[in-house]
Amino acid sequence: MEEDYLPVVVGAAVIGDHVLRLLFSDGTVGDLDFSSERWTGVLEPLNDSAHFAQVEVDRGAGTVGWPGGIDLAPEPLYEQAKAHPVAAA
């Protein structure tokens, strides 16, 4: 029986103000534009461009994270990346 497979984030780069380019383990690359987001609660520090730019890949969780223990669930990131793919160069 084949289990459901969710690709994980293996690369991340800030390519604009609150815009991430994410690379997933299945080769999917997508640009995610968070510029219209107004983060609240524990995510509020992400409103600051300098804090947002400190994004790192959390290999243990398979997603992206920021200082202060902030991370985003990988499932919606993957769905957004598939909806906004970057063509291979």
Where are these regions (language model features)?
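Motif-centric detector for short Cys/His coordination patterns
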Residues: 1-89
